[in-house]
Amino acid sequence: MKKSYLIKPLLDSHYPTAEYGKGIYIYDDQHKQYIDGSSGAVTASIGHAVPEIIEAMLRQAEKISFVYRSQFTTEEAEKLAERLSQIDFIKEGHYSSFFVNSGSEATETAMKIAIQHWQEQGMPTKNKVISRWTSYHGITMGSLSLSGHSERRRRFVSLLDDLPTIPAPYCYRCPFNQEYPGCQLKCATELEVAIQRMGADNIAAFIAEPIIGAAGAVIFPPEGYYEKIKEICDKHHILFIADEVMTGIGRTGKMLAMEHWGVVPDIITLGKGMSAGYTPLAATLVSEKVMEPILQGSKIIMSGHTYSANPQSAAVSLAVLDYIEKHNLVEKAAENGDYLLTQLQGLAKNYSIIGDVRGKGLMVGIEFVANVFSKFPFSKDKSLTNIIVSVAREKGLLIYPASAGIEGGDGDAVIISPPLTIKKHEIDQLVEIFKETIAEVQSEIIGDHHQKIISLDDHQ
């Protein structure tokens, strides 16, 4: 085999070579077809090789592809910032945008701006940004410090701040062994406890993914959770940052996932879907309330990247947003997401390794368990998630490996999040391959004794 000089995620693994993509499909150099059932890393939200996006890329390349942000602004970057500020749900907040290349950078920028917001008002001790366990906000040291993802933190723990402070709203595995609504949203009121312990004078902001992605396989909270979180933040003069890198730009059936709960954040991070994978691009959106002390003070955001506000990327993002709007993809994500969720929930009745199926829009998480009644996970040495992802890929379906389970990490789960352009007959095709995958894994790898021979009703 020819030596590869490319550092890949698993250094001893063989990866197929992608040759081209079309719509929801990717084709390798052996002409094998794959359904992009996860939009890559929940990124390729409008599918592959969309002509309108390619045309926008070419038009901008002929015009100008790079200027440095301290020397020029561009029409494309200005238009994109204005376009994002006009998202209906946040329009009244008059948000300004800081453009970067990745979600990790967007998180870092959000942290810096939140801290600077308080520094400009003479409150330098408000310099901690706290978060939740069972979360993932990025792989840079600052964003990883915020991430309650034990596996990704482990190698660098000596370099990281311990910023995750409260448990996630993980109703399938409630950390308090309670049930909603009798729990009285203890997962949210724990933020109050954490603030009292640390002191509000030391906390700049609280960050959360509206729907937890990689660390929890689409965990979303019970009703009233984010209302309570925002109430607590406002009470203690703490900014609320919503990490919408994975959930934003239509993925959940709303332009922004926070719209499901009607709670408007002070700062929002975006990525992935805002360029749909056609270019590296992310953004930190900052409300007028947060910007005002900086505008009245130093008048500079202490952050910067070489490719920030890149006009080529901005032009691509504008074309992606146009395409989403023209084809009503946010509404279609809601409609087709309900269909996908129903189809996948139907599988759980027949396969006992499926513990929970949860989702909003075209973002669905499937958590696997060794025992459907105790919810006990499989042992780590089984590497069940990797097996399921591998078998699905062999059958022509790409799905996203995620964490879940006890302590939000000792368990197995995947995310299914196809492009927003997927049609119902393509969903049927996706679900059929996933069904074949689970059937094979359960019967041949896990063992026949896991075949579901009694229904939940019989058990009860």
Predicted region positions:
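Conserved N-terminal phosphate-binding loop of PLP-dependent enzymes in the Aspartate aminotransferase
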Residues: M1-Q460
